[in-house]
């Protein structure tokens, strides 16, 4: 590597294509992650979302379907993230599906909160999490917007979820 003037140190990367070079700062920014924790009100359904790379803003989609409108559902996801869901008492989790029945809302039967929604697509579990269930996150980082999916066909809906929802999901029922 040639060093002249004030050039930054570079790192070579290989990602299945031709090698390319990035500055050290750009490489670190890309791999830096943010851990977001959340849970239902009583803590029976808890999650840890590793968001990579760490976002300047977090998209928060206020779904306009009848269920989310009545429940105040505002969801986020990062397809590059990793989600771990831990359920303390699975007997206190109710899963609700409606409409196309392609998603399950995980409702805590003790406190009534819906911290996650999952969708099983091609034998793979995808998820979104409720921003209202976040613990300790600065709410000014949320970029809120409405999201309406009425009239969306099932094939389009599942393709959108595969693109946009969290694909790395671990769901653990720990029991009591």
Regions found by a protein language model. Name each.
Residues 23-39, 44-176:
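A short Gly-Trp-Pro
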Residues 5, 16-17, 25:
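Residue-identity detector for glycine
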Residues 1-4, 10, 156-158:
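Coiled-coil-like amphipathic alpha-helices with heptad-repeat character
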């Amino acid at each position: 590597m040639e060093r002249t003037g004030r050039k930054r140190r570079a790192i070579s990367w290989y990602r299945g294509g031709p090698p390319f070079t990035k500055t050290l700062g750009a490489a670190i920014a890309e791999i830096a992650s943010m851990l977001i924790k959340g849970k239902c009100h009583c803590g029976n359904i808890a999650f840890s979302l590793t968001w990579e790379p760490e976002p300047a803003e977090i998209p928060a989609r206020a779904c306009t379907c009848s269920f989310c409108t009545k429940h105040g559902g505002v969801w986020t996801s990062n397809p590059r993230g990793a989600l771990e869901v831990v359920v303390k008492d699975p007997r206190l989790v109710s899963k609700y599906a409606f409409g196309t029945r392609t998603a399950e809302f995980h409702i805590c039967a003790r406190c009534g909160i819906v911290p996650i929604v999952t969708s099983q697509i091609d034998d793979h579990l995808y998820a979104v999490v409720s921003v209202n269930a976040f613990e300790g996150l600065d709410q000014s980082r949320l970029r809120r917007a409405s999201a309406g999916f009425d009239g969306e066909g099932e094939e389009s809906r599942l393709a959108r979820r595969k693109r946009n929802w969290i694909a790395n999901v671990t769901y653990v029922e720990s029991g009591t």
